């Protein structure tokens, strides 16, 4: 569920594509064509075309934005097959298994930012160095985005697809019914500068909560949003795990468990079927919204709620998420895979993904340009997403990543906080469960 960054072509092309922004978001969910593996190796089809396989998770949007169709029209001898596994927590272990065996890999494999450090430190020799690919230029990428996928020997094994600057998505109509401000500037002001103010707004909302709709979807989502505003979260700059004592983690944990205790959360696990159904049925009024989340909301809330969702600034700047495209050395169609990965992450394709998916560009040079800064999305009440996310991206701290970032984060949300939200455990019991699970994971 993420997207693009630089290549060799003129930024003018980016502007031309982004100028069309406002046409809307996601038109449909990616094929759920997975066969239980992180990828399937490519080859040829019965018509003599070269089949390039792409292993992804969630809604990355290449298909939805028409990029696969566009590429195959430009290259009629190529056929693209996308294999989707959802969520990323299921996808990544399978990717590691296939890397270990050297078989079953797609020609292109997506890697989520929470896993990229482990891949660059332990698996880099199993991927192509994309910094040497024709058309790839380092300067087209945010420095920190490029460095996240660069190993110690200088080999860059992934091209960034997006970044995840933070906002808050909210149901304007539910805020009105609850007697809260509904104008996005006024809503942003409700909680400006402090996540605790966000909870206070939730308590005011709960006094007149309409139709049984909770204030927020998930304590786990709130935790991830708040913790993503830190620079040293699960690891310090020396590479030492600090999740037990991290001030950022402890503060986000208290925020999330306080929200649960105050019954502000719908108690859902994000990205699951119940969460998707809750969106479709209007069962919560806000969600922590990195840029890529807008595509999720539009997809699962559907046309029924077009114009009722809006986007406000987050209490504090943060970056949650982002992905990369990598090409395994074991890819059957390695040369064609490199060409496709380079093309998919080129600036003009990045702009098309922004247009269709609200997948926020990694090209910082585009942020202040009017075609990006003034971008609006009809589904979200013409929210100025270019302005909102540009500011959040500029203000977000550079995060220290460690090998097990994704695992640690998942255990806090899907073990600790789920026990609190869905099993009635205390905040302290949930914390101990998360810490124990993380300790065990890091000992393996």
Task: List the predicted regions and their residue ranges.
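Extracytoplasmic/periplasmic substrate-recognition and gating elements
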Residues: 261, 300-362
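Glycine-centered hinge/linker elements that transmit conformational signals in sensory
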Residues: 199-202, 239-269
């Amino acid at each position: 569920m993420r997207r693009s960054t630089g290549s060799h072509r003129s930024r003018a092309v980016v502007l031309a594509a982004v100028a069309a922004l406002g046409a809307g978001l996601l038109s449909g969910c990616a094929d759920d064509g997975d066969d239980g593996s992180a990828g399937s190796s490519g080859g040829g089809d019965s018509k003599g075309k070269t089949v390039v396989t792409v292993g992804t998770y969630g809604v990355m949007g290449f298909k939805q934005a028409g990029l696969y169709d566009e590429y195959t029209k430009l290259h009629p001898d190529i056929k693209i097959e996308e294999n989707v596994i959802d969520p990323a927590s299921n996808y990544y272990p399978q990717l590691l298994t296939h890397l270990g065996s050297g078989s079953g890999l797609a020609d292109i494999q997506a890697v989520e930012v929470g896993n990229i450090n482990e891949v660059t430190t332990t698996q880099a020799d199993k991927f192509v160095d994309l910094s040497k690919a024709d058309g790839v230029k380092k300067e087209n990428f945010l420095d920190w985005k490029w460095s996240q996928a660069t190993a110690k020997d200088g080999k860059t094994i992934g091209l960034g697809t997006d970044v995840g600057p933070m906002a808050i998505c909210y149901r304007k109509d539910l805020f009105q019914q609850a007697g809260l401000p509904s104008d996005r500037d006024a809503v942003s002001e409700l909680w400006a500068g402090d996540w605790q103010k966000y909870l206070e707004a939730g308590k005011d909302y709960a006094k007149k909560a309409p139709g049984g709709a909770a204030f927020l979807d998930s304590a786990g989502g709130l935790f991830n949003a708040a913790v993503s505003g830190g620079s040293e979260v699960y690891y310090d700059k020396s590479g030492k795990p600090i999740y037990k004592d991290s001030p950022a983690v402890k503060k986000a944990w208290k925020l999330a468990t306080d929200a649960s205790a105050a019954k502000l959360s719908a108690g859902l696990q994000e990205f699951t079927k119940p969460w998707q159904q809750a969106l479709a049925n209007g069962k919560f009024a806000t969600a922590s919204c990195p840029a890529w989340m807008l595509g999720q909301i539009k997809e699962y809330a559907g046309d029924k709620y077009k114009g009722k969702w809006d986007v406000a600034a987050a209490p504090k700047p943060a970056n949650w998420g982002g992905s990369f495209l990598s090409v395994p050395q074991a890819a059957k169609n390695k040369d064609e895979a490199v060409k496709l990965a380079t093309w998919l992450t080129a600036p003009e394709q990045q702009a098309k993904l922004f247009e269709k998916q609200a997948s926020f560009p990694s090209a910082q040079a585009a942020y202040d340009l009017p075609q990006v800064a003034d971008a609006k999305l009809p589904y979200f009440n013409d929210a100025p997403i270019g302005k909102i996310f540009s500011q959040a991206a500029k203000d977000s701290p550079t995060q220290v990543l460690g090998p097990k970032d994704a695992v640690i984060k998942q255990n806090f949300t899907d073990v600790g906080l789920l026990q609190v939200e869905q099993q009635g455990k205390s905040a302290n019991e949930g914390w101990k469960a998360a810490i124990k699970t993380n300790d065990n994971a890091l000992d393996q």
